[in-house]
A protein has these predicted regions:
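Residues forming the flavin
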Residues: 1-291
Length: 291
């Protein structure tokens, strides 16, 4: 999305192919799924306009020290994000506002000459003489291009498989796997702030925990802690369970949650490029079977 925005601002007319739905249709599909409806494999918490980030809580934390981060923050504010993200130490947009921001960025790209195609999955890469020449969409239409930006995320497993089948250079890398844990927000507030934890001057509290077993080379740590948020069903494949955490702007649900993760490496799941995906699917299926 930001690649397209930068290109459009510099006089190009990018074409964006999104395998999922626009953010409004996507929101409806997700709400139906959360209420017990059928999962739509291309319109869910992972896939659709804005990617998985649209249904996160919009924490804008990074360890990267780069001047371009300011440009990203400015673009968010121009699209409707809270102005305080420019100066807060832990800037936060909120899922409810992110949906508006994503839509406004889309309209900005279109106003600058870009085009966006929803429900348009890249099903093949057209390669000639080791150079990208275009993409195939939905096994039908072909578009020529001298440059292709692939915003693949971590859930487009079929696209990883496609890249592998095309002989694209890839390698397995470590990642983390775990669960989501919930607590009453008051419990976390009191632990962090003490007896004055109910003061209206204080924001809802968060936390970060890490344990490192140096002998075994294994770490357990909290990740993406969502104060005043909720745990959400985030699967993108039938018969599997995935969860995520998110918070709206006001963070007022009364429930805190965090991922609790352990690192895994190719020594755990195998050194073939796609072994990590098989490892993930195995545990997602086990969670589904367990209910």
């Amino acid at each position: 999305m930001f690649s397209a925005l930068v290109l459009a601002k510099n006089g190009y007319r990018p074409l964006i192919f999104e395998r999922g739905s626009d953010v409004d249709t996507r929101h409806q599909d997700i709400e139906k799924f959360w209420q017990g409806g059928q999962l739509k494999e291309n319109s869910n918490v992972q896939f659709g306009e804005g990617g998985a980030g649209t249904f996160s809580d919009g924490k804008l934390t990074t360890r990267i020290n780069d001047s371009k981060i300011t440009d990203v923050i400015e673009a968010f504010v121009e699209a409707g994000a809270p102005p305080e993200i420019k100066y807060l130490h832990k800037p936060h947009i909120g899922t409810d506002i992110l949906r508006i921001v994503v839509k406004n960025i889309r309209e900005k790209i279109k106003a600058l000459g870009g085009e966006i195609f929803f429900n348009s999955q890249v099903t093949d890469f057209i390669i000639k003489d080791d150079k990208i020449c275009g993409v195939e969409i939905n096994h039908k239409e072909k578009f020529t291009a001298s440059d292709v930006f692939l915003g693949i995320g971590h859930s487009a497993r079929d696209t990883y498989e496609l890249l592998y089948s095309k002989g694209i250079s890839m390698e397995a890398k470590p990642f983390a796997i775990g669960v989501r844990i919930e607590h009453p927000q008051d419990l976390i507030d009191k632990a962090q702030y003490g007896e004055d934890y109910k003061s209206e001057l204080l924001p809802v509290a968060d936390y970060s925990l890490t344990y490192n077993n140096r002998q075994k080379g294994r770490s357990v740590y909290s990740f993406c802690m969502c104060p005043g948020g909720q745990v959400v069903a985030a699967a993108s494949e039938l018969g599997r369970v995935v969860v995520n955490g998110m918070s709206n702007y006001k963070r007022n649900s009364g429930i805190a949650n965090s991922a609790l993760l352990v690192n895994v490496t190719p020594d755990d799941f195998g050194h073939n490029v796609l072994d990590g995906i098989a490892f993930q699917r195995h545990y997602e299926e086990m969670a589904y079977i367990c209910g």
